[in-house]
């Protein structure tokens, strides 16, 4: 089974404040395949983290196709312990703004075969962090936030 690693990061200056996300898609050997940076408007750190995961799910589904994703192991790596533990089902969602984002991810996951979320140290997520900070610095609108109406654009 092929394995894809998706590094995601979201950040906010002000929390809530101007927010950005970074997504890096790599093969199982760690070779980068694609990277994305996007400005998210005004969000909290956790909302930005969730938006990055949503974008990653939507993008990998588009890149691989609906059939191939069922036979591909997808490992998300993020440096937000809270978000990774919530997505793995270990922590409750107590913030009502995060619940719809969690549900969106839950529904997107249904199309995938094996998918899991792993918390990693910030040092191992430098590239996604750099992309998120770049988006916040530039107010970059290279992509739109992941949304049901039309999906992401690059």
Regions found by a protein language model. Name each.
Residues 1, 153-154:
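Short, low-complexity, intrinsically disordered N-terminal peptides in bacterial proteins
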Residues 1-47, 58-60:
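RNase H-like nuclease fold core
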Residues 11-15, 54-136, 140-142, 146, ...:
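RNase H catalytic domain
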Residues 29, 151-153:
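Charged/polar low-complexity intrinsically disordered segments
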Residues 49, 53:
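Short, conserved alpha-helix that lines the donor NDP-sugar binding/gating region
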């Amino acid at each position: 089974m092929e394995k894809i690693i998706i590094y995601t990061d979201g950040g906010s200056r002000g929390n809530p404040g101007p927010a950005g996300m970074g997504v890096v898609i790599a093969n199982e050997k760690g070779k980068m395949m694609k990277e994305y940076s996007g400005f998210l408007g005004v969000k909290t750190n956790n909302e930005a983290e969730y938006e990055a995961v949503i974008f990653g799910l939507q993008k990998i589904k588009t890149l691989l196709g609906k059939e191939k994703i069922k036979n591909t192991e997808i490992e998300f790596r993020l440096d937000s312990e809270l978000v990774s533990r919530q997505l793995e089902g270990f922590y409750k969602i107590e913030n009502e703004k995060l619940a719809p984002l969690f549900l969106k991810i839950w529904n997107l996951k249904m199309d995938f075969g094996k998918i899991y979320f792993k918390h990693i140290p910030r040092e191992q997520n430098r590239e996604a962090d750099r992309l998120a900070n770049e988006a916040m610095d530039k107010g970059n609108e290279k992509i739109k936030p992941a949304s049901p109406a039309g999906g992401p654009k690059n």
